[in-house]
Design a protein with these regions (language model features):
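Transmembrane alpha-helical segments that form core, pore/gating elements
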Residues: 39-41, 64, 124-126, 130, ...
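Hydrophobic transmembrane alpha-helices of multi-pass small-molecule transport proteins
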Residues: 64, 136-158, 175-179, 210, ...
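Specific transmembrane alpha-helical segments of multi-pass solute transporters/efflux pumps
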Residues: 32, 36-37, 65-111, 116, ...
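Helix-helix packing/entry segments at the starts of transmembrane helices
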Residues: 53-55, 112-119, 185-208, 236-276, ...
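C-terminal transmembrane-helix exit sites in multi-pass transporters
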Residues: 63-72, 120-145, 268-287
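Juxtamembrane helix-entry segments on the extracytoplasmic side of multipass membrane proteins
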Residues: 18-23, 46-50, 54, 77-83, ...
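Cytoplasmic-side transmembrane-helix entry/capping segments in multi-pass membrane proteins
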Residues: 80-88, 136-148, 168-169, 193-203, ...
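Glycine-/small-residue-enriched transmembrane alpha-helix faces in small-molecule transporters
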Residues: 2-54, 60, 161-188, 209
Protein backbone atom coordinates (compact mmCIF):
# COMPACT_ATOMS: atom_id res chain seq x y z
CA UNK A 1 0.00 0.00 0.00
CA UNK A 2 1.37 3.44 -0.98
CA UNK A 3 2.40 5.68 1.88
CA UNK A 4 0.83 9.08 2.34
CA UNK A 5 3.15 11.89 1.25
CA UNK A 6 5.16 13.42 4.08
CA UNK A 7 4.11 16.96 4.95
CA UNK A 8 6.74 19.28 6.35
CA UNK A 9 4.81 21.24 8.95
CA UNK A 10 7.57 23.82 9.33
CA UNK A 11 7.63 24.47 5.59
CA UNK A 12 3.84 24.68 5.56
CA UNK A 13 3.93 27.27 8.35
CA UNK A 14 6.62 29.28 6.55
CA UNK A 15 4.58 29.25 3.35
CA UNK A 16 1.48 30.37 5.23
CA UNK A 17 3.47 33.17 6.90
CA UNK A 18 4.87 34.35 3.56
CA UNK A 19 1.38 34.30 2.05
CA UNK A 20 0.06 36.47 4.90
CA UNK A 21 3.02 38.86 4.61
CA UNK A 22 2.47 39.30 0.87
CA UNK A 23 -1.31 39.73 0.99
CA UNK A 24 -2.60 41.06 4.30
CA UNK A 25 0.66 42.31 5.81
CA UNK A 26 1.21 45.34 3.54
CA UNK A 27 -2.26 46.71 4.21
CA UNK A 28 -1.90 46.22 7.97
CA UNK A 29 1.40 48.09 7.81
CA UNK A 30 -0.17 50.90 5.76
CA UNK A 31 -2.96 51.29 8.31
CA UNK A 32 -0.61 51.25 11.31
CA UNK A 33 1.84 53.70 9.75
CA UNK A 34 -0.74 56.14 8.38
CA UNK A 35 -2.74 56.20 11.61
CA UNK A 36 0.38 57.31 13.46
CA UNK A 37 -0.03 60.85 12.13
CA UNK A 38 -3.51 61.68 13.50
CA UNK A 39 -2.98 59.61 16.66
CA UNK A 40 0.24 61.49 17.45
CA UNK A 41 -1.57 64.80 16.98
CA UNK A 42 -4.31 63.59 19.34
CA UNK A 43 -1.70 62.86 22.01
CA UNK A 44 -0.24 66.34 21.61
CA UNK A 45 -3.41 67.78 23.13
CA UNK A 46 -2.29 66.30 26.47
CA UNK A 47 1.49 66.87 26.45
CA UNK A 48 4.03 69.21 24.89
CA UNK A 49 5.77 67.76 21.82
CA UNK A 50 9.26 67.10 23.21
CA UNK A 51 7.82 65.86 26.51
CA UNK A 52 5.53 63.52 24.59
CA UNK A 53 8.43 62.24 22.49
CA UNK A 54 10.65 61.77 25.55
CA UNK A 55 8.01 59.57 27.19
CA UNK A 56 7.52 57.64 23.96
CA UNK A 57 11.25 57.08 23.53
CA UNK A 58 11.72 56.05 27.17
CA UNK A 59 8.94 53.45 26.95
CA UNK A 60 10.26 52.15 23.61
CA UNK A 61 13.74 51.78 25.11
CA UNK A 62 12.30 49.91 28.10
CA UNK A 63 10.38 47.47 25.91
CA UNK A 64 13.32 46.89 23.58
CA UNK A 65 15.71 46.34 26.50
CA UNK A 66 13.41 43.63 27.81
CA UNK A 67 13.30 41.99 24.38
CA UNK A 68 17.09 42.21 24.07
CA UNK A 69 17.51 40.43 27.41
CA UNK A 70 15.47 37.53 26.04
CA UNK A 71 16.75 37.51 22.44
CA UNK A 72 20.37 38.50 23.15
CA UNK A 73 21.02 40.15 19.76
CA UNK A 74 24.44 41.14 18.47
CA UNK A 75 25.63 44.60 19.53
CA UNK A 76 27.76 46.98 17.44
CA UNK A 77 31.32 45.67 17.36
CA UNK A 78 33.28 48.92 17.21
CA UNK A 79 33.07 52.66 17.77
CA UNK A 80 32.41 53.31 14.08
CA UNK A 81 29.28 51.13 14.12
CA UNK A 82 28.05 52.86 17.29
CA UNK A 83 28.65 56.27 15.71
CA UNK A 84 26.62 55.32 12.62
CA UNK A 85 23.65 54.36 14.80
CA UNK A 86 23.92 57.57 16.81
CA UNK A 87 23.95 59.74 13.67
CA UNK A 88 20.96 57.95 12.15
CA UNK A 89 19.18 58.09 15.50
CA UNK A 90 19.65 61.86 15.64
CA UNK A 91 18.44 62.37 12.08
CA UNK A 92 15.38 60.14 12.44
CA UNK A 93 14.30 60.40 16.07
CA UNK A 94 15.34 63.99 16.83
CA UNK A 95 15.02 65.77 13.48
CA UNK A 96 12.28 63.77 11.78
CA UNK A 97 10.05 62.95 14.75
CA UNK A 98 10.98 66.02 16.79
CA UNK A 99 10.28 68.53 14.03
CA UNK A 100 7.17 66.60 12.92
CA UNK A 101 5.70 66.82 16.43
CA UNK A 102 6.63 70.51 16.69
CA UNK A 103 5.00 71.08 13.31
CA UNK A 104 1.77 69.41 14.42
CA UNK A 105 1.75 71.41 17.64
CA UNK A 106 2.20 74.59 15.57
CA UNK A 107 -0.96 73.73 13.65
CA UNK A 108 -0.07 71.91 10.43
CA UNK A 109 -2.71 69.50 9.14
CA UNK A 110 -1.54 65.91 9.53
CA UNK A 111 -2.39 65.17 5.90
CA UNK A 112 -0.10 68.00 4.76
CA UNK A 113 2.70 66.79 7.07
CA UNK A 114 2.33 63.23 5.76
CA UNK A 115 2.52 64.49 2.19
CA UNK A 116 5.61 66.65 2.77
CA UNK A 117 7.63 63.90 4.48
CA UNK A 118 6.49 61.37 1.84
CA UNK A 119 8.60 63.29 -0.69
CA UNK A 120 11.67 61.68 0.93
CA UNK A 121 12.15 58.98 -1.76
CA UNK A 122 12.25 61.69 -4.44
CA UNK A 123 14.85 63.78 -2.62
CA UNK A 124 16.96 60.69 -1.92
CA UNK A 125 16.84 59.83 -5.61
CA UNK A 126 17.78 63.34 -6.70
CA UNK A 127 20.53 63.88 -4.10
CA UNK A 128 21.98 60.36 -4.31
CA UNK A 129 24.36 61.19 -7.22
CA UNK A 130 26.12 63.85 -5.13
CA UNK A 131 26.41 61.70 -1.99
CA UNK A 132 26.56 58.07 -3.11
CA UNK A 133 27.44 58.29 -6.80
CA UNK A 134 24.12 57.02 -8.19
CA UNK A 135 23.04 58.24 -11.60
CA UNK A 136 19.91 60.36 -11.94
CA UNK A 137 17.74 60.43 -15.05
CA UNK A 138 14.87 62.43 -16.50
CA UNK A 139 12.31 60.17 -14.80
CA UNK A 140 13.47 61.14 -11.31
CA UNK A 141 13.54 64.83 -12.19
CA UNK A 142 9.99 64.51 -13.52
CA UNK A 143 8.92 62.80 -10.30
CA UNK A 144 10.58 65.51 -8.22
CA UNK A 145 8.82 68.33 -10.08
CA UNK A 146 5.44 66.60 -9.86
CA UNK A 147 5.94 65.84 -6.16
CA UNK A 148 6.91 69.39 -5.31
CA UNK A 149 4.10 70.86 -7.42
CA UNK A 150 1.55 68.57 -5.78
CA UNK A 151 2.77 69.34 -2.27
CA UNK A 152 2.67 73.07 -2.98
CA UNK A 153 -0.83 72.66 -4.42
CA UNK A 154 -2.11 70.95 -1.26
CA UNK A 155 -0.65 73.68 0.95
CA UNK A 156 -2.06 76.54 -1.17
CA UNK A 157 -5.46 74.84 -1.54
CA UNK A 158 -5.89 74.98 2.23
CA UNK A 159 -5.64 78.77 2.23
CA UNK A 160 -3.21 81.65 1.65
CA UNK A 161 0.20 81.39 3.29
CA UNK A 162 1.16 83.86 6.01
CA UNK A 163 3.73 83.93 8.79
CA UNK A 164 1.70 81.74 11.16
CA UNK A 165 1.00 79.05 8.54
CA UNK A 166 4.50 79.15 7.05
CA UNK A 167 6.22 78.22 10.32
CA UNK A 168 4.64 74.75 10.61
CA UNK A 169 5.43 74.08 6.93
CA UNK A 170 9.09 74.98 7.49
CA UNK A 171 9.21 72.63 10.48
CA UNK A 172 7.75 69.86 8.30
CA UNK A 173 10.39 70.56 5.65
CA UNK A 174 13.01 70.27 8.40
CA UNK A 175 11.56 66.85 9.28
CA UNK A 176 11.79 65.90 5.59
CA UNK A 177 15.46 66.96 5.56
CA UNK A 178 16.07 64.79 8.64
CA UNK A 179 14.60 61.59 7.20
CA UNK A 180 16.23 62.25 3.81
CA UNK A 181 19.60 62.78 5.48
CA UNK A 182 19.19 59.51 7.37
CA UNK A 183 18.48 57.58 4.18
CA UNK A 184 21.43 59.14 2.34
CA UNK A 185 23.71 58.46 5.31
CA UNK A 186 22.58 54.83 5.39
CA UNK A 187 23.18 54.49 1.65
CA UNK A 188 26.73 55.81 1.91
CA UNK A 189 28.05 54.88 5.34
CA UNK A 190 25.51 52.70 7.10
CA UNK A 191 26.43 49.25 8.36
CA UNK A 192 24.34 46.12 8.73
CA UNK A 193 23.12 45.87 12.30
CA UNK A 194 20.55 43.79 14.18
CA UNK A 195 17.20 45.67 14.08
CA UNK A 196 16.69 45.26 17.84
CA UNK A 197 19.95 46.89 18.86
CA UNK A 198 19.70 49.44 16.06
CA UNK A 199 16.27 50.61 17.20
CA UNK A 200 17.31 50.52 20.86
CA UNK A 201 20.31 52.78 20.24
CA UNK A 202 18.32 55.15 18.04
CA UNK A 203 15.45 55.53 20.53
CA UNK A 204 18.03 56.09 23.27
CA UNK A 205 19.59 58.89 21.21
CA UNK A 206 16.14 60.40 20.76
CA UNK A 207 15.54 60.34 24.51
CA UNK A 208 18.98 61.77 25.37
CA UNK A 209 18.40 64.76 23.07
CA UNK A 210 14.68 65.39 23.57
CA UNK A 211 14.39 64.98 27.36
CA UNK A 212 16.81 67.82 28.28
CA UNK A 213 15.23 70.08 25.64
CA UNK A 214 11.81 69.35 27.11
CA UNK A 215 13.02 70.18 30.62
CA UNK A 216 14.61 73.43 29.44
CA UNK A 217 11.96 74.79 27.09
CA UNK A 218 8.62 73.16 27.90
CA UNK A 219 6.30 72.79 30.83
CA UNK A 220 6.52 69.06 31.35
CA UNK A 221 3.05 68.59 32.80
CA UNK A 222 1.19 65.69 31.23
CA UNK A 223 -2.54 65.05 31.37
CA UNK A 224 -2.61 61.30 31.99
CA UNK A 225 -6.07 60.77 30.56
CA UNK A 226 -7.24 57.44 29.10
CA UNK A 227 -7.00 58.99 25.63
CA UNK A 228 -3.38 60.04 26.14
CA UNK A 229 -2.42 56.63 27.54
CA UNK A 230 -4.10 54.94 24.57
CA UNK A 231 -2.28 57.14 22.04
CA UNK A 232 1.03 56.55 23.81
CA UNK A 233 0.45 52.79 23.85
CA UNK A 234 -0.39 52.83 20.16
CA UNK A 235 2.70 54.82 19.19
CA UNK A 236 5.03 52.63 21.27
CA UNK A 237 3.50 49.26 20.39
CA UNK A 238 1.72 49.88 17.08
CA UNK A 239 4.25 52.22 15.46
CA UNK A 240 7.61 51.65 17.15
CA UNK A 241 7.36 47.87 17.48
CA UNK A 242 4.67 46.17 15.37
CA UNK A 243 4.85 48.38 12.25
CA UNK A 244 8.65 48.35 12.11
CA UNK A 245 8.80 44.59 12.77
CA UNK A 246 6.20 44.01 10.05
CA UNK A 247 8.17 46.17 7.63
CA UNK A 248 11.33 44.13 8.27
CA UNK A 249 9.42 40.85 7.94
CA UNK A 250 7.93 41.90 4.60
CA UNK A 251 11.38 42.94 3.42
CA UNK A 252 12.77 39.52 4.37
CA UNK A 253 9.88 37.92 2.47
CA UNK A 254 11.19 39.59 -0.67
CA UNK A 255 8.40 42.10 -1.22
CA UNK A 256 10.39 45.31 -1.00
CA UNK A 257 8.77 46.76 -4.14
CA UNK A 258 5.29 46.02 -2.82
CA UNK A 259 6.05 47.77 0.46
CA UNK A 260 7.57 50.74 -1.36
CA UNK A 261 4.50 51.08 -3.56
CA UNK A 262 2.23 51.17 -0.50
CA UNK A 263 4.13 54.19 0.81
CA UNK A 264 2.59 56.12 -2.09
CA UNK A 265 -0.77 55.76 -0.35
CA UNK A 266 0.35 57.00 3.08
CA UNK A 267 -0.64 60.66 2.44
CA UNK A 268 -4.21 59.94 1.26
CA UNK A 269 -4.63 57.26 3.95
CA UNK A 270 -3.40 59.72 6.59
CA UNK A 271 -5.83 62.33 5.20
CA UNK A 272 -8.78 59.94 5.52
CA UNK A 273 -7.78 58.85 9.03
CA UNK A 274 -7.22 62.49 10.03
CA UNK A 275 -10.80 63.22 9.00
CA UNK A 276 -12.03 60.25 11.06
CA UNK A 277 -9.97 61.01 14.20
CA UNK A 278 -9.56 64.79 14.05
CA UNK A 279 -12.26 66.08 11.72
CA UNK A 280 -9.65 67.62 9.39
CA UNK A 281 -11.16 68.24 5.96
CA UNK A 282 -9.18 68.74 2.76
CA UNK A 283 -10.78 70.81 -0.03
CA UNK A 284 -11.37 69.07 -3.36
CA UNK A 285 -8.48 70.92 -5.02
CA UNK A 286 -6.12 69.59 -2.34
CA UNK A 287 -7.10 65.99 -3.16
CA UNK A 288 -6.24 66.57 -6.83
CA UNK A 289 -2.91 68.13 -5.85
CA UNK A 290 -2.20 65.20 -3.51
CA UNK A 291 -2.82 62.84 -6.43
CA UNK A 292 -0.20 64.73 -8.46
CA UNK A 293 2.30 64.46 -5.59
CA UNK A 294 1.66 60.73 -5.12
CA UNK A 295 2.12 60.24 -8.87
CA UNK A 296 5.42 62.09 -8.64
CA UNK A 297 6.69 59.82 -5.86
CA UNK A 298 5.58 56.75 -7.84
CA UNK A 299 7.36 57.91 -11.00
CA UNK A 300 10.56 58.81 -9.14
CA UNK A 301 10.80 55.51 -7.27
CA UNK A 302 9.49 53.12 -9.92
CA UNK A 303 12.00 50.53 -11.07
CA UNK A 304 11.33 48.76 -14.39
CA UNK A 305 11.32 44.97 -14.29
CA UNK A 306 14.28 43.34 -15.96
Amino acid sequence: MAQAPHIDRNEEERTSERRWLTTVGPFVFLLLWSAGFPIAKTGLHYASPLTFLSIRFALSVGVLLAVCVVRRPQWPRNARAWLHLVVVGFLVQVMYFGLSYLSMTAGIATSVLALIVSLQPILVGVLAPKFVGERIGARRWTGLLLGLAGAAGVIVARGPLHAESLGPVLLAIGALIGITGAMLYEKRLGTTQDPLTSNLVQYSVGFVFCAPMALLFEHTQVQWTPTFIATLAYLVIGNSLIAITLLLAMTRAGKVSQVASLFFFVPPAAAVLSYVFLGEVLPAAAWWAMGVAVLGVAIATWTPRK
